[in-house]
C-alpha cells in the first residue's frame, strides 16, 4: 500500500499530535516522512525468503542497565501541553471518525 505524503496528511498528523507547524516545518516533516516510507519500500523489496526470523533483534544481549531516575512531576509533564484540563491532556475526539 502506497501512502501519499501530501499537505492533507501533514495537516491530519499535526491535528492528531496537537502541534502547530509553520510552512517550513511542514515541508521538512513531509520530506522526512517520505524518506522514511521510501526506506521501508526498499526493505519490502528485499528477498528474505532464505533468512531465518530472529526471536529478538538484539542478539548480543548487551542491554543498558536499568537506572532509577526521579520521574517528572505532573506540572513538569504538562508544561508543554497545548490543551489540558484538571491535570490531564485533552486530545482530539476520535470516536466516530
UniProtKB/Swiss-Prot annotation:
<dbReference type="GO" id="GO:0006412">
    <property type="term" value="P:translation"/>
</dbReference>
<dbReference type="GO" id="GO:0006450">
    <property type="term" value="P:regulation of translational fidelity"/>
</dbReference>
<dbReference type="GO" id="GO:0070681">
    <property type="term" value="P:glutaminyl-tRNAGln biosynthesis via transamidation"/>
</dbReference>
<keyword id="KW-0067">ATP-binding</keyword>
<dbReference type="InterPro" id="IPR036113">
    <property type="entry name" value="Asp/Glu-ADT_sf_sub_c"/>
</dbReference>
<dbReference type="GO" id="GO:0005524">
    <property type="term" value="F:ATP binding"/>
</dbReference>
<dbReference type="InterPro" id="IPR003837">
    <property type="entry name" value="GatC"/>
</dbReference>
<comment type="subunit">
    <text>Heterotrimer of A, B and C subunits.</text>
</comment>
<protein>
    <recommendedName>
        <fullName>Glutamyl-tRNA(Gln) amidotransferase subunit C</fullName>
        <ecNumber>6.3.5.-</ecNumber>
    </recommendedName>
</protein>
<comment type="similarity">
    <text>Belongs to the GatC family.</text>
</comment>
<dbReference type="GO" id="GO:0050567">
    <property type="term" value="F:glutaminyl-tRNA synthase (glutamine-hydrolyzing) activity"/>
</dbReference>
<comment type="function">
    <text>Allows the formation of correctly charged Asn-tRNA(Asn) or Gln-tRNA(Gln) through the transamidation of misacylated Asp-tRNA(Asn) or Glu-tRNA(Gln) in organisms which lack either or both of asparaginyl-tRNA or glutaminyl-tRNA synthetases. The reaction takes place in the presence of glutamine and ATP through an activated phospho-Asp-tRNA(Asn) or phospho-Glu-tRNA(Gln).</text>
</comment>
<keyword id="KW-0436">Ligase</keyword>
<keyword id="KW-0648">Protein biosynthesis</keyword>
<dbReference type="Pfam" id="PF02686">
    <property type="entry name" value="GatC"/>
</dbReference>
<keyword id="KW-0547">Nucleotide-binding</keyword>
<dbReference type="GO" id="GO:0050566">
    <property type="term" value="F:asparaginyl-tRNA synthase (glutamine-hydrolyzing) activity"/>
</dbReference>
Amino acid at each position: 500500500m502506497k501512502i501519499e505524503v501530501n499537505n492533507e496528511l501533514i495537516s491530519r498528523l499535526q491535528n492528531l499530535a496537537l502541534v502547530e507547524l509553520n510552512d517550513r516545518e511542514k515541508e521538512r516533516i513531509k520530506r522526512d516522512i517520505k524518506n522514511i516510507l521510501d526506506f521501508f519500500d526498499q526493505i519490502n523489496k528485499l528477498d528474505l525468503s532464505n533468512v531465518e526470523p530472529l526471536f529478538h533483534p538484539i542478539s548480543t544481549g548487551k542491554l543498558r542497565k536499568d537506572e532509577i531516575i526521579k520521574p517528572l512531576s505532573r506540572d513538569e509533564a504538562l508544561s508543554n501541553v497545548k490543551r489540558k484540563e484538571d491535570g490531564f491532556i485533552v486530545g482530539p475526539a476520535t470516536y466516530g471518525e
